[in-house]
Amino acid sequence: MPKYKYNKINILFSCCLLVSFVVAPLVVQAQEDPLVTQAREAAKEAKPLVQELLHLKNQQQFEKVEQNFEKAQRFLEDNRPNQEQIVEQLKSAKDVQTITKITIDFGGEEIFLDFDEVTKHYLNQPLSAKTVFALTKELTQVLYNAGYVTSAIGLKSSKIKNGEVEFVVLWGKVNDILVEEQQASLFKDKAMLFVLPNLKGKVLRIYDVDQLIEILNTGNKTAKVNVIAANEKSMSNLSIERHRTSYPQVSLSLNNSGEGSNAEGRNQATLSISWSDLLGTNDRWSFSTGYRIYKDRQANRQQNYSLSYTQPFSFSTLDIKLSYSGYKKQLRGIHTHGSSGETKQASFKLSHTLLRNKDMILSLYGELEFKRRLSYFGDIRIGKYHNNKLNIGLSYVTNLGHGKLYSDLSYSNGLRWFNANHSAYNSHRDKTLRLVSGSINWQRPFVFFNRGMSYQFRLGAQYGFDSLYGENQFSIGDEYTVRGFKGGAGSGDRGFYISQTVTIPFYPQKSYLSYINPFLGIDIGKVHAKRPHHVVDTFAGFAFGVKAQIKSLALSLTYAKPINGVGTFEESNKKSVFYFTGSVSF
């Protein structure tokens, strides 16, 4: 049965159920219409859970952006190395013979390197030892810029005929991967090496070593890779120095992300536990849970749990995630009834690094999501929804405009596997979900009045080809999208947001205070929903606040306010809001 029809039947069924509770009171209280009121509340019974899931999705996207910015800062070079250009000096030489042709022998390796930008400047230049030396130096720099730091380039023959200069690339290769300059003997060390890229016998490229460093450094293990000469000619060993710790990383935090009052679940306590290298395979495990704090904890409850496992394999990474979200809420009329619901989700994501160098990292990923949601009114189940989805996307990290850029683009398609429900609809029938989503995130430092600052730009967008159900919608209006609102002020099948923030970092150099960062931001976003009612909402807000790190305590406080005159929204969304997050890690 189509889902939108199923929901109507659910509401009708709930109304019939409510008649048994309200008929008698209506005889003596005809002035009220509790049936309509409670039916309306029953129709909205899943709203708290959907809001929480959309908020978690925005939070995860925000954290993913921050992680990729950190990766860019660590592995991408800020500036290209200066290449010495001495061609102009060579033009004044008086040698009669000139360079007529330059050839480069790659030694049988199928590696593409663009030497043309260098060689074209040397054609028809005077042929001399000084010229050949300068040319060799620049060709070697091309090798180094491409990451082949143990390779070299030299003359194929010392005899140059008719101005034809022949070069050959002498490739440096990997002989073996060692641990502390020794063959791995411990089980965990062998397991650690087993999942690394197989570089033995291959040309050594420093950006492949970067991949090793990224895989090896987990929360419970720090590692660095040294390149040392091997006994064989043109061969090098990669020696890993590692230090392991035994205890997990634990973080306790408190935030006020809820839209209600303190009694209505505004505050949320969360616990995060990260543990890595348990299997020795550079594996990462994390568990997190969130619990909203209500005044009446027997009648109202909202909690979520998440368990994830990350396993790298060479240039690929497998992510497995299991999550659960549930809620319980009282519906008040003449009689009080409870509504409740839960969502269970499993996802499997495989990502692969396609290209990696000093300027960019390009990755491809595919993800399968399986989701099941149950809804109850009292003890009666009024909704059962099963949804599967396939996501395919690209992520890109690069240098841009003296800053770092992270962008991603993905396509999602609903799957009808295992008798799953449709996840979209139009005016005629239920449909399979199809949507495109992406983000562009740019961050760069700058100096203003001799003060170092940082500017960050974020753009997120989604386009749904049909009307979407529930948590597949695009939501804005929280601390991660358009600040100045709470609870997901607007959602729709398609939309976008733009968030801009200027941060002024201070590093007091105190033992108790690592940093204090005031910031100022302005955001705008728009969502469009076609059904059940055609709605276009625009939201804008500004924010200012401060973030600080005091030993193991991290604090963030933000004041944000909607910008009046931009869009039309409910009166409850016109008030200023405060976002607070405090966490302690150990």
From Swiss-Prot:
Keyword Transcription set for record: no
Gene3D superfamilies for this protein: membrane protein fhac (3.10.20.310), membrane protein fhac: a member of the omp85/tpsb transporter family (2.40.160.50)
GO terms for MF: porin activity; protein transmembrane transporter activity
Signal peptide: 1-30
Gene Ontology cellular component list: cell outer membrane; pore complex; type V protein secretion system complex
Domain POTRA: 97-172
Keyword Transmembrane appears in the UniProt entry: yes
Swiss-Prot/TrEMBL keywords: Cell outer membrane, Ion transport, Membrane, Porin, Protein transport, Signal, Transmembrane, Transmembrane beta strand, Transport
One GO process term, biological-process aspect: monoatomic ion transport
Chief localization: membrane
Matching InterPro entries: Hemolysn_activator_HlyB_C, Polypept-transport_assoc_ShlB, POTRA, TPS, TPS_OM_transporter
Cellular localization per UniProt: Cell outer membrane
The protein's role, per its UniProt record: Possible member (with IbpA) of a two partner secretion pathway (TPS) in which it would mediate the secretion of protein IbpA (high molecular weight immunoglobulin-binding protein).
Entry's family note: Belongs to the TPS (TC 1.B.20) family.
UniProt free text on domains: Probably a beta-barrel protein.
Protein name as it appears in the record: Outer membrane transporter protein IbpB
Species per Swiss-Prot/TrEMBL record: Histophilus somni (strain 2336) (Haemophilus somnus)
Upper lineage: Bacteria, Pseudomonadati, Pseudomonadota, Gammaproteobacteria, Pasteurellales
